[in-house]
């Protein structure tokens, strides 16, 4: 849903047409805020319930303050001990900071989160930006989008400098730590960039 939102924001709302939806889950697009964000009129009616502890609708983040608010709203959704919630908060913060600091995404990052009764949470962060390959190729040579993703997952690799270990402000360790945290916890994260896909 975040990817649809990010892509949709690149299109003039006058050029977006929404056909009559037949799916029983059509209210989900309204409830998660997709149609409102894209300024698409909807005649879908539903009973709105408090989202607390279940989901966070699509949220557009362009500043550190907006990121802090999102993470604050996200913590109750996690249903975790404070230490575990802090780790997830770090991951989301690091990924969104990558968008804010590196991607030059005009619309910032688009996030949403959903908690499932099976004790699973899905968090999606999307943007329409330069892409990892363009950013990494400022300092390194990646032949493909997948090569760029693989480089970005190595510690000390950042698109801001070729200096080993990055810089004081940007050590190039965020994605490496996130990959490691996911691996240790037997979780996973997915990166799509250009034509590259990593899971």
Question: What is the meaning of each model-derived region?
Answer:
Residues 138-197:
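Flexible ATP-lid and adjacent glycine-rich G1/G2 motifs of the Bergerat
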Residues 36, 42-67:
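Internal, well-ordered alpha/beta segment that forms a basic, Gly-enriched binding/recognition surface
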Residues 57-85:
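Intrinsically disordered, low-complexity linker/loop segments enriched in Gly/Pro
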Residues 130:
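Glycine-rich G1-box
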Residues 1-39:
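Amphipathic alpha-helical interaction surfaces in cytosolic regulatory modules
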Residues 127:
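Acidic ATP/Mg2+-coordinating residue in the GHKL
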Residues 119-123:
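Short beta-strand element(s) in the Bergerat
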């Amino acid at each position: 849903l975040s990817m649809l939102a990010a892509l949709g924001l690149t299109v003039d709302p006058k050029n977006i047409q929404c056909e009559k939806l037949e799916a029983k889950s059509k209210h989900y697009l309204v409830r998660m805020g997709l149609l409102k964000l894209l300024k698409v009129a909807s005649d879908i009616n539903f009973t709105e319930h408090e989202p607390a502890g279940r989901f966070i609708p699509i949220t557009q983040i362009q500043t550190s303050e907006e990121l802090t608010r999102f993470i604050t709203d996200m913590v109750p959704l996690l249903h975790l001990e404070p230490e575990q919630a802090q780790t997830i908060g770090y991951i989301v913060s690091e990924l969104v900071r990558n968008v804010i600091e590196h991607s030059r995404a005009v619309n910032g990052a688009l996030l949403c989160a959903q908690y499932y009764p099976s004790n699973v949470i899905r968090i999606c962060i999307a943007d329409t930006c330069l892409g990892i390959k363009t950013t990494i190729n400022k300092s390194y040579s990646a032949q493909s989008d997948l090569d760029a993703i693989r480089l970005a997952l190595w510690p000390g690799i950042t698109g801001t400098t070729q200096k080993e270990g990055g810089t004081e402000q940007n050590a190039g360790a965020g994605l490496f730590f996130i990959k490691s945290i996911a691996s240790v916890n037997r979780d996973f994260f997915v990166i799509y960039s250009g034509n590259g896909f990593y899971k």
